[in-house]
Design a protein with these regions (language model features):
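Flexible, acidic/Gly-rich N-terminal and inter-domain linker regions that tether
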Residues: 1-135, 139-188, 352
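The −1 position to Zn-ligating cysteines in a subset of zinc-ribbon hairpins
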Residues: 99, 355, 463
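Conserved non-cysteine loop/helix-boundary elements of the Radical SAM core domain that shape
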Residues: 118-135, 155-276, 280-337, 341, ...
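C-terminal accessory regions of radical SAM enzymes
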Residues: 330-445, 451
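Conserved acetyl-CoA binding element of GNAT-fold acetyltransferases
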Residues: 458-485
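Conserved acetyl-CoA-binding loop-helix of GNAT-fold acetyltransferases
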Residues: 480-500
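Conserved GNAT acetyl-CoA-binding A-motif
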Residues: 500-514
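Conserved active-site alpha-helix within GNAT-family acetyltransferase domains
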Residues: 514-538
Length: 542
């Protein structure tokens, strides 16, 4: 008897036919679309099968073939070797008496401070009632639906100054995020676990947290704040710097100073954390020249020199104090063309050891009363740079995974180790990279801390602040000939860092503050957890 002609069986038959064709011919993207149209029509489907629908019918042995790379959506999501999962904390009040003049949202609006309710991450948070477990689980499920296999997760905690929230809430929030990764793909009933239990489970989980990003104000990144963030598992801390002009900071009611920025940067860096800056060109009182000088000074002045950078041109949003100034004619924001000109000029001076992660906030244009409304500002800036024959030297523009997504030929690279040394915050930084033809395959950040470092674990030791191998994310325990992960390149960089720490600086120990999901990686390479500490240490004396 013939099988029932249901939509499901039609879809499965069509998907299997397409998979069999792909297994035998491996066409390009254009040919794939033709095949999908032809088979979908022949099987009587009302619509053309989508890539993720075909992926549902892949067999286990087919999951490791080139078919997955052809069908997976949004390859840029994992091109840097990891997946990001952004989660939003519940709305809470600004930690100071009055929000900054440009800052929208807040408890009275039902959103975290500085958010509008229309940002994708916030909308996911609202839909989940700000439940961290559900936010992480839903995001991982979204990735899987698109054909991805999320295994290494950089958790990004958004929603304002996280260290200013209730301490018990901070611990509960991070614990539940980790538990979602530990339980995935199965939603499980709530069960109380301590932070330490959740971290221990994640060391061997299918989905591992390789790092946690937290946002804070400079005056909420003192030594005791930093210690709390480290205990929670933070590996990258993003600071709302905005500008390096104290008068402008006072004018917008920022409530902190440039001195706070310098101190926070040093404390975080000395503790082994990565440091990111948020900068806001176009603030009231700042000129184009002053904005450009800020974007140059954060790299020329050794008191700053962040590892990561996000640039958010100032926007006028209804309901803010700045909106009232704009209505009264006392303020005008940077327009699209002005912002592009400024950013193109700034890109000329970005060093090779910074990653420019974003240059625009994710805000719908219809909400913006004045300011940059182009949603593709980064693409416009990149196109202008190419037209001028300028290649940005930042990490993001050179990393091999994104180069492959852009269609550049990276098939025959023979990366070599390069070392760049620079002073920062009273200590010494070494950017140890694997490069070829200016393509960046991976890097390691090694620090010799300043004399003011407060964490006992780092005193007298070299500190590995970051180790990253680029290219498509390869799940834990697997290998791919087409990718750079899991081929010993990380171990090569580690060995070089240990050699430099020992031979160049005479250090006898090297420590690292790894994400909880990466502890096993370092353990295999001779690192051991220090007693009652999240740090891992290896002796390197001859």
């Amino acid at each position: 008897m013939a099988p029932p002609s249901t939509t499901h069986s039609k879809e499965e038959r069509a998907a299997r036919r397409i998979i069999e064709i792909l297994m035998s011919s491996m066409p390009d993207r254009m040919e794939l679309n033709k095949i999908k149209h032809k088979v979908s029509e022949e099987e009587g489907l009302e619509k053309v099968l989508k890539d993720y629908e075909i992926l549902r019918y892949l067999k286990e042995d087919e999951m490791k073939t080139g078919i997955v790379n052809l069908l997976v959506g949004k390859k840029v999501r994992s091109a840097s070797g990891i997946y990001t999962v952004a989660v939003m904390t519940k709305p809470s009040r600004c930690p100071k008496d009055r929000p900054c003049s440009y800052c929208p949202g807040g408890v009275d609006y039902g959103t975290p401070q500085s958010y509008l309710g229309k940002e994708p991450a916030l909308m996911r948070g609202i839909q989940s009632n700000f439940d961290p477990y559900r936010q992480v689980m839903y995001r991982l499920t979204q990735y899987s639906t698109l054909g991805h296999r999320p295994s290494k997760i950089q958790l990004i905690i958004m929603g304002g100054t996280f260290p200013a929230t209730d301490l018990d809430y901070q611990e509960w929030f991070v614990t539940r995020c980790l538990e979602a990764m530990n339980d995935y793909p199965e939603f499980k009933p709530y069960r109380w676990r301590s932070l330490e239990e959740a971290q221990l489970r994640n060391e061997s989980s299918r989905v591992r947290c390789i790092g946690i990003t937290m946002e804070t104000r400079p005056d909420w990144a003192k030594e005791h704040h930093t210690d709390r963030m480290i205990r929670l598992g933070a590996t990258l801390v993003e600071i709302g710097v905005q500008t390096l002009d104290d008068e402008t900071l006072m004018r917008v009611n920022r409530g902190c100073t440039v001195k706070d920025v310098k101190e926070a940067t040093r404390i975080l860096r000395d503790s082994g954390l990565k440091v990111g800056y948020h900068m806001m060109p176009g603030l009231p009182g700042n000129t184009r020249e002053k904005d450009l000088e800020d974007l140059r000074r954060i790299f020329s002045d050794e008191d700053f020199r962040p590892d990561y950078l996000k640039i958010y041109p100032t926007l006028v949003i209804e309901g803010t104090e700045l909106y009232a100034e704009w209505l009264a004619g006392r303020y005008r924001a940077l327009g699209n063309d002005e912002a592009v000109d400024l950013l193109v000029e700034a890109h000329k001076n970005f060093p090779k050891w910074v990653r420019v992660a974003r240059i625009q906030r994710d805000v719908p244009a219809h909400i913006i009363r004045d300011g940059v409304t182009k949603s593709n500002l980064r693409e416009i800036v990149d196109a202008r740079l190419r037209m001028l024959g300028i290649r940005c030297r930042c990490i993001r523009c050179r990393e091999v995974g994104l180069a492959r997504v852009r269609g550049e030929d990276v098939s025959n690279l023979r990366p070599e180790i390069k070392v760049e040394e620079y002073a920062a915050g009273g200590g010494i930084e070494l950017f140890i990279s694997l490069e070829d033809q200016d393509f960046l395959v991976g890097f390691l950040r090694l620090r010799v801390p300043s004399e003011r470092a407060h964490r006992p674990e780092v005193i007298g030791a070299g500190v590995i602040r970051e180790l990253h191998i680029y290219g498509p994310q390869i799940p834990v325990g697997e290998k791919s000939r087409e990718a750079y992960q899991h081929h010993g390149l990380g171990a090569t960089l580690l060995s070089k860092a240990e050699e430099i720490a020992r031979d160049r600086f005479g250090l006898k120990r090297i420590v690292v503050l790894p994400g909880v999901g990466v502890r096993g990686y370092y353990r295999k390479r001779g690192y051991r957890r220090l007693p009652s500490s999240p740090y891992m240490m290896k002796r390197i004396a001859q």
